[in-house]
């Protein structure tokens, strides 16, 4: 595989994940800030690797595989850490919704790829809005700077959960015909 910067950025994001988890558990006052900073850097590299891959025409199958995996592992890690820290039903429910959606849509994309119809379920604007709300919510809940930030982050978490459900419904509707045509009971 030929080296390219977008792939390097994606691999860098994967490498950040254990440091992200370690930073969360550091027994120092600045741990929430450091954790959020790592999460923010991962988010920037996620945007940048896709932008550069398209701009420089360096998209690869490996990048197309690894990029969403890195994203999902980082988001799931953040959700698990936040649920553990908050230890409340009100955070756990949207986290379960988001993690479930990621698993379902990943499986759906794999299924559609098997059928040769992967392009039918490309990322939608609903998915992009969901991701934006989700990242802002997770960043706020990781940082925990003050009560106002936490309240705003929880509101964004619920907005993200609603968009999560909505975007999943949209993806399933697009794939419904292909799914029904290929179900064998």
From Swiss-Prot:
GO biological process: glycerophospholipid biosynthetic process; phosphatidylglycerol biosynthetic process
Record's GO cellular component terms: plasma membrane
Pfam family, one: CDP-OH_P_transf
Gene3D superfamilies, alphabetized: 1.20.120.1760
Main location: membrane
Annotated organism of origin: Haemophilus influenzae (strain ATCC 51907 / DSM 11121 / KW20 / Rd)
InterPro entries membership: CDP-alcohol_PTase-I, CDP-OH_P_trans, CDP-OH_PTrfase_TM_dom, CDP_ALCOHOL_P_TRANSF_CS, Phosphatidylglycerol_P_synth
Protein known as: CDP-diacylglycerol--glycerol-3-phosphate 3-phosphatidyltransferase
Membrane topology: Multi-pass membrane protein
């Amino acid at each position: 595989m030929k080296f390219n910067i977008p792939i390097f950025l994606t691999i860098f994001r994967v490498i950040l994940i254990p440091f992200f988890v370690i930073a969360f558990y550091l027994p120092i006052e600045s741990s929430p800030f450091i954790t959020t900073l790592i999460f923010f850097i991962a988010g920037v590299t996620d945007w940048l690797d896709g932008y550069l891959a398209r701009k420089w025409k360096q998209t690869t199958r490996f990048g197309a595989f690894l990029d969403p995996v890195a994203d999902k592992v980082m988001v799931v890690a953040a959700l698990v850490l936040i649920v553990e820290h908050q230890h409340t039903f009100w955070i756990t429910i949207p986290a379960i919704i988001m993690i479930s959606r990621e698993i379902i849509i990943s499986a759906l994309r794999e299924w559609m790829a098997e059928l040769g119809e992967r392009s039918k379920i490309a990322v939608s604007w609903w998915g992009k809005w969901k991701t934006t709300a989700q990242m802002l919510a997770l960043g706020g809940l990781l940082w925990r700077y003050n009560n106002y930030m936490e309240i705003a982050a929880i509101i964004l978490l619920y907005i993200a959960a609603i968009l999560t459900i909505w975007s999943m419904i949209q993806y399933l509707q697009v794939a419904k015909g292909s799914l029904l045509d290929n179900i064998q009971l």
